[in-house]
Design a protein with these regions (language model features):
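Hydrophobic/aromatic-rich, well-ordered segments within soluble, folded domains that form packed cores
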Residues: 170-173, 321, 326-332, 804-817, ...
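Short, flexible, solvent-exposed loop/turn segments with mixed acidic/basic and small polar residues
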Residues: 2-9, 783-786, 923
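Conserved short alpha-helical segments that host acidic/polar catalytic motifs at enzyme active sites
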Residues: 1-464, 470
Length: 1002
């Protein structure tokens, strides 16, 4: 390395490489890079082995430590210093990455160099000897330390990335990445021109959320977009409902919103290209970013105050970044540029307002065509509802409350019915998908009280070229509510608007045709529509009759969406669904999540007319439909907010679901990249379900069918219908056994439950693998010892009565088990043993975001303190304790106001991150050093990695709650039945992840 003549400053580029340790593969990778550099018109100067001290590493980091080398590249004489040279290096790096997947290019630039690894920040300087050299100076330093709670740690996924460090999570990353893939087809840059083909895929499909955002920002920068502008359009501030924002700035954000959806989620992002350094905060401000400016022109920004020791008398300014705001330092000009001045320089670049006025089309402004809406007779509508699998409960308990009250029906208790894949019923495909949600690593959002940052707008039509600013880019249709009335759909279908070309594509097929063939025909029809100039396709299942059945709407939408992604057309063609199938909030959420831009639920809306005709709904039809649509929209926003997502534009196509009980072949083919750990139904099974419902509506023998809707027993037990774990017989047997103290009767109850478990849950499919020889009974742990580990579920005072709450505590104390207060606090008089000698004090005291009833006495009386991060029945949201139930004695215990309703727990920003949880654990341990600290999580994909972070944060107990947990109040269908995963999956994942990380014995 000492013999390499690298030339003057910025006349050379430095690459930092993680290479394989195998000598042969190392030589091959190095040679490959040298050839590519020369082929791209540059001169390779030589290699340098980076001096390191591996002894400072931990065991796991040392085991997978790569070979770390630096490569030097000379700038060609005909290339300008700075960005132009970095662009050449970027192209060379992308070509190398595509030809060598075993190596990782940490950085390759003439302006920046990245040192990183799988270790703590305190080990950075000790590991890299370069950083101990006092002559090593830089005007800019970005340093990042993280818990690594949403990805498994590795050398490659450590921060910093090439242009950013990111504290937070991009919750919409699946949709963002898919859309960037599709944009490759229509993005053109004067700076990259024919080189563009070498740069795809722009986004690394195997990268983390931060890595893929870094890929996108780097590509935009290399395509000619200034880095601050790229940050503004990927992480925009909340502008749509901000009346205090200038018209020019709102026009700017509106223009770019037509081409780039927000990369949504909690984020404090620092960025640099070597000349400028900046920081931006997400639209909700869900990550702290504080900074000092000193009298010697230093800017120190960090998530915490006090990360560096220095004389505070030199501080001339203390400030923090505000939600959506940006700060920039230009080291070339020696300027600190604040948010307003920085953004002003971009929002006035073009006449965005004029462009929008001339091109952006609003749904409300489209003319209503002189075309009649297709209507159905009473009998026809019943027949179609049977064909689409409607049940009596869905209409009465879901559609009716939404049309009547404008909000989703509230339910209580938990779920004791089978998973869709285990049910004997023919469930709609929607029921096989479970909603994911935020816990610990980022907070859910209160969509009602944070309305200013929430946007429901969706854009329909072909997307413009984000790399070129021009008026026609924003020639799209803007829809404020993606749930369309029949009139809305007619306006779109017959729109006489330039650049909005609409084509109907049927999703019905002749009964008897294999479903996979019908989907292939659908692909051909969509491709033909696009070839003929359509940039909006309406997938419609109107046309179901005795000979034609409909492809399940979710399957049709997702299949077409992924087909368009694969053929790089998804930003050129928008999908609108006209379907009789969706009727519940969860149905619409999955359709949006898998690619639909808007949905017209024509049959659900017609069922409202039937409710009015039957006298069950006394309301104007159009008002009722409007309330139903708004209720659905509100429900979707709430589902998105549980994941920390503020905009439906970002939620659309983000696939934030886990499939339970669908075969891998179906997932890979039609729901690509969906998390799925339990296989099940095939494409033939799905077709069988479709045919079953169709045959109930259309009898091929010509017999008269019963067209009344079946009561399936989803919410209440119905004999001969859906199985329930707790049915009248099991409940009666348990109650009688308890009342009569009859152990034999109790054994009958447990036998019934174990027998009933089989068709209901995953654990019912398992059996014990008994050894050939058992253990003598005298060697088995005693009953008295076993029951000490019994704990009741957390049920708050207020959700259940005082008598029930106290009885549970007394019973558990008598057997030396532990009862749990729930989040509602506990009466002071219960903290001491009463004169009757009964101990009513719950051993486990729960602490949730509302801190209801949490006092010093409450905490010191605990044997275990449980931090409630989420609840199985309603993860990411709180139940509603109505004002009428907040009695004076409830309010006293909770330290709230009588007669004022409570959201329990409130989704405010109590825990922003794993660091916040670590702080709370520390504080609670100081309040009661004898109590064990427990953290309650809910089962979902990735909970094991979160649990590993929780263990690192100091928790001694981790509770995994399942989707079937109980609640006092939550949306019946969207939350109780469709959020969260079985605890069996979460428990297994958590156990395995803790073992893998050496944390299980802690």
């Amino acid at each position: 390395a000492a013999n390499i003549n690298i030339g003057k400053e910025r006349e050379y580029g430095i690459g930092m490489f993680f290479f394989p340790n195998d000598e042969l593969r190392l030589r091959q990778a190095k040679k490959m890079f040298e050839i590519i550099v020369e082929k791209e018109g540059m001169t390779f100067l030589g290699w340098r082995e980076v001096p390191t001290t591996p002894t400072v590493l931990g065991k796991k980091a040392l085991e997978c430590m790569p070979k770390i080398l630096q490569g030097f590249v000379a700038k060609p004489a005909d290339v300008e210093k700075g960005l132009d040279f970095d662009r050449k290096l970027y192209i060379a790096r992308k070509v190398f990455e595509q030809s060598n997947e075993e190596s990782y290019v940490v950085s390759l630039s003439s302006r920046t160099i990245v040192y990183k690894g799988m270790f703590l920040v305190g080990q950075l300087r000790l590991f890299y000897n370069d950083l101990q050299d006092k002559d090593y100076e830089s005007a800019i330093a970005l340093v990042h330390s993280r818990f690594s709670t949403n990805t498994v740690p590795s050398w490659e996924k450590a921060h910093p990335y090439r242009y950013i460090v990111h504290n937070g999570e991009i919750n919409t990353i699946r949709g963002n990445a898919d859309k960037m893939l599709a944009r490759e087809e229509n993005m053109e840059s004067d700076y990259l021109k024919d080189e563009m083909i070498k740069l795809t895929p722009v986004v690394d499909p195997n990268g983390s959320d931060s890595a893929r955002l870094d890929n996108t920002l780097e590509f935009l920068l290399m395509s000619g977009m200034p880095l601050p502008l790229a940050m503004m359009i990927t992480i925009p501030e909340p502008w749509e409902n901000n009346e205090g924002m200038s018209r020019e700035k709102r026009d700017f954000y509106q223009y770019y919103a037509t081409m780039m959806e927000p990369w949504d989620g909690p984020a404090s992002i620092l960025f640099t290209d070597g000349d400028i350094m900046g920081a931006v905060l997400d639209r909700n401000g869900l990550r702290p970013s504080r900074y000092y400016i000193t009298d010697d022109d230093q800017l120190i920004l960090s998530s915490e105050v006090g990360v560096l020791d220095f004389d505070t008398t030199h501080i001339v300014k203390k400030e923090r970044l505000h939600p959506g705001k940006m700060l920039l330092v230009d080291t070339v000009k020696g300027e600190l540029i604040d948010d307003e001045i920085l953004k002003d320089s971009y929002v006035k670049n073009q006449p965005y307002g004029e462009w929008l006025s001339d091109n952006l089309v609003f749904l409300k402004d489209l003319k209503i065509p002189n075309v009649a809406v297709e209507e159905y007779s009473y009998e026809e509508s019943n027949r179609l509802m049977k064909a689409f699998g409607y049940s009596y409960e869905e209409v009465k308990d879901s559609v009716l409350p939404m049309a009547l009250n404008g909000s989703e029906a509230i339910g209580a208790m938990g779920v004791d019915t089978p998973l869709a894949v285990l049910s004997k019923r023919h469930h709609p495909l929607f029921d096989y998908f479970k909603q994911l949600f935020a816990q610990v690593t980022n907070p859910p959002i209160d969509a009602i009280r944070e309305e200013i940052v929430t946007s429901t707008s969706i854009y329909v039509g072909g997307e413009g070229n984000v790399l070129e600013e021009k008026a026609e880019n924003c020639h799209v249709l803007k829809i404020h509510n993606p749930i369309l009335t029949n009139t809305d759909l007619l306006k779109i279908r017959y729109a006489k608007v330039k650049n909005i070309n609409v084509k109907d594509v049927p999703i019905t097929y002749y009964k008897g045709t294999p479903l996979d063939k019908a989907i292939n025909h659908l692909y051909v029809a969509v491709d033909q529509a696009h070839k003929n100039g359509a940039n909006v396709v309406i997938l419609t299942d109107r046309g179901v009759d005795e000979n034609h059945v409909a492809i399940p709407s979710l399957l049709a939408v997702s299949a077409v969406h992924h087909h368009l992604i694969e053929t790089k057309k998804s930003t050129s063609v928008s999908i609108i669904l006209e379907s009789g199938e969706p009727r519940e909030v969860h149905h619409f959420a999955t359709l949006l999540g898998y690619g639909a831009c808007a949905i017209n639920p024509y049959l659900a809306q017609f069922s409202i007319k039937k409710l009015i005709q039957d006298g069950l709904l006394k309301k104007d039809y159009y008002a009722a439909v409007n309330d139903y649509n708004n209720a659905v929209l509100h429900g979707i926003v709430k589902i998105a907010s549980k994941m920390g997502i503020s905009t439906l534009q970002s939620y659309q196509g983000s696939q934030i679901f886990e499939a339970v009980g669908i075969s891998k072949k179906v997932i890979d083919e039609y729901f690509t990249n969906t998390v799925s750990r339990v296989e099940g139904i095939t494409i033939e099974d799905i077709a069988e379900d479709v045919d079953y419902h169709h045959s109930k509506a259309f009898d091929m023998l010509g017999l008269k069918n019963d067209l009344s809707l079946d009561s399936e027993g989803d919410h209440k037990y119905r004999s001969g219908k859906e199985e329930h774990l707790y049915n009248p017989l099991t409940i009666h047997t348990l109650q009688t056994a308890a009342w009569t103290n009859n152990y034999e009767l109790f054994k009958q109850y447990t036998s019934m439950i174990n027998k009933e478990t089989s068709p209901v849950s995953l654990r019912g499919l398992m059996d014990f693998n008994y050894p050939s020889k058992g253990v003598p009974i005298e060697e088995v742990e005693s009953v008295d010892s076993i029951v000490k580990r019994f704990k009741t579920g957390a049920m708050s005072y207020g959700s259940i009565s005082k008598e029930a709450h106290e009885t549970l505590a007394i019973a558990m104390n008598m057997i030396h088990g532990k009862s749990n207060t729930g989040e509602g606090g506990e009466d002071l008089e219960r903290l001491t043993v009463g004169p009757d000698g009964l101990n009513k004090c719950s051993a486990i005291k729960q602490v949730a975001s509302g801190r209801f009833g949490v006092t010093s006495r409450y905490l010191v009386s605990a044997q275990e303190i449980q931090i409630k991060m989420a609840q199985g029945a309603k993860p990411g949201e709180g139940g509603h304790l109505p004002a009428g139930k907040v009695y004076p004695w409830i309010a006293k215990t909770r330290h709230s106001t009588p007669g004022v309703g409570l959201i329990s727990p409130p989704p405010h920003h109590d825990i922003y991150s794993i660091e916040d949880l670590a702080q709370l654990i520390y504080d609670l341990k100081n309040a009661n050093r004898n109590a064990r600290i427990s953290v309650k999580l809910v089962s979902e994909a990735g909970v094991g990695t979160v649990a590993a972070g929780v263990a690192k944060a100091g928790a001694q107990v981790i509770l995994i709650s399942g989707h079937d947990g109980g609640t006092g109040a939550a949306p019946r269908n969207s939350s109780i039945h469709n959020a969260g995963l079985p605890w069996e999956l979460g428990l297994a994942e958590t156990h395995q992840t803790l073992i893998m990380n050496g944390l299980r014995n802690k």
